[in-house]
Amino acid sequence: EGVSDGVKAKILKIAKELHYERYLRNSKTGYIAVLVPEVFMETKEIFYTSIFKYLYAEAIKKNYYLTLYVVSRWEEQNPAPPSLCRADKVDGVILLGQLALNYVKALRPIALPTVLLDFNYTNLGLSCICTDNIEGMYKATKYLIERGHTKIGFVGNIRLTNSIRDRYLGYYRALIESGIRIDSRFILKERDDANNDIGLALPSEMPTAF
């Protein structure tokens, strides 16, 4: 629930390609740490909690347990590896949802197999599993356009995560290709640049689709 079969299959496929299971065969603890930003564990957020449930179910099949660690906003701004991320406590680390660049950099010296899930920092050279947000949003927007919509809204702050930015690029591309002018009134943010929930300020003239 909340995670498509395609995403699930992609996670398993790439994990095998990255030989994550091979690293874990030599494990000693039987635990994998999953680090997720605090903002993605709020009550109304279901995407990452759904992914975690799926990862947990798959880990159990391999006789591993996942240990969830919620990274607070303060920790992201004052990066240091949590005590959980040590070779005598876990055999690998999954970073679930985009964490601040400096926080991810602070984890590099721990020398444990690490995978970024649903985000990437290309300059760090870490393994990642990402969905194709650009193409996915492009197809979704084209679908609406083909059904006659020209006033299409977008919800998300593109400064917050790579995923939101990539979705916007797919949305933008579909509108441009179809000769539809981007209307700034229909670009809505539900969070500010500090990732605080600010609610949606709806325009006086609403788009016909989102």
Regions found by a protein language model. Give the residues of each.
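N-terminal helix-turn-helix DNA-binding module of bacterial transcription factors
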Residues: E1-K28
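Bacterial carbohydrate/catabolite-sensing allosteric modules
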Residues: K13-E21, I51-L66, P109-L116, Y121-F210
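Amphipathic helical "hinge" segments at domain boundaries
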Residues: L18-P81, K89, L169-Y172
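Structural motif
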Residues: A33-L35, I94-L96, A209
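Glycine/Thr-rich phosphate-binding loops of Rossmann-like dinucleotide-binding domains
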Residues: E42-T43, Y103-V104, G125, N162
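Short beta->alpha connector loops
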Residues: S72-E76, L95-L101
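Short acidic/histidine-rich motifs immediately flanking catalytic phosphotransfer sites
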Residues: R86-G92, S204-A209
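Active-site-adjacent beta->alpha loops and helix N-cap segments on the catalytic face
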Residues: A100-A111
